[in-house]
Amino acid sequence: MVASSPETLISAAQKCLCSRKKRLSPSSCLEVTIHIIAVDLGVKPALLYDSNGASPDQLQLYLHSLQESSVVSNSLRIMSINDNTFIINPDIMKSHLGELLKSKSLPLIDVCSSRKRPVLCAFERSAEEMVRSFLEVFMNGLDLVVLEEELYKDWNLCTFFGILLGYPASYWFEQTQGFENCLSMTPLVVCTVWVRWQIHEIKQRCCLYSFSVPEELWSDVQSHIQRWTDHLRERFSKQTVLTDICFSRDTVTLPSVTL
């Protein structure tokens, strides 16, 4: 990995990722770069880009600039689904999804609005079908993949995005009942994972993962999340670019939760 200057990376991000909605701040530019580096290093399978509404083509342009500067490898891909754009490490993603299909061990949390409280449910067949359908498209090897609505119109994208991002648990709800959920005023355990990246004199801190689990279900999923944490530590130890990994946990209660 070539150590480009912070100014060069910030300038490239602001140039490539310009948007009518929002100009990226220098700090945001470096955070985006850290996320992409983490994907490239296999610390996380994918990044959902939601910083300022930049298009998939703009993201591809920025990714190419990072690749040309040898900041990241040439193996990353971009996928767009329902106006959401992901940057994906194909090898890590295939391994991640293959293991998921084999074990079917991902805890799904049913938060249908018709329920009084969230409950754990088995790995739904619909979730398995989403993963298999995605892999069939993803295996075509294109650098930029745009999923057609016909493919994902019946998918629960909340569940699917949680799977793609490598979360140790994902929310699920019956879409035919609407998109509301039963998490209002429900205590949630919010887990975050932080890292640092030193580039010249700057030590940039970044939140790599943030996910939640209803507090009343924590004891049921704690062992699974601990295994996920141990596996993440193992992957993190195989690289030296990112440092100071830190895990934190807080409990919050909100009047409404958007998934």
From Swiss-Prot:
<protein>
    <recommendedName>
        <fullName>UPF0739 protein C1orf74 homolog</fullName>
    </recommendedName>
</protein>
<comment type="similarity">
    <text>Belongs to the UPF0739 family.</text>
</comment>
<dbReference type="InterPro" id="IPR027850">
    <property type="entry name" value="DUF4504"/>
</dbReference>
<dbReference type="Pfam" id="PF14953">
    <property type="entry name" value="DUF4504"/>
</dbReference>
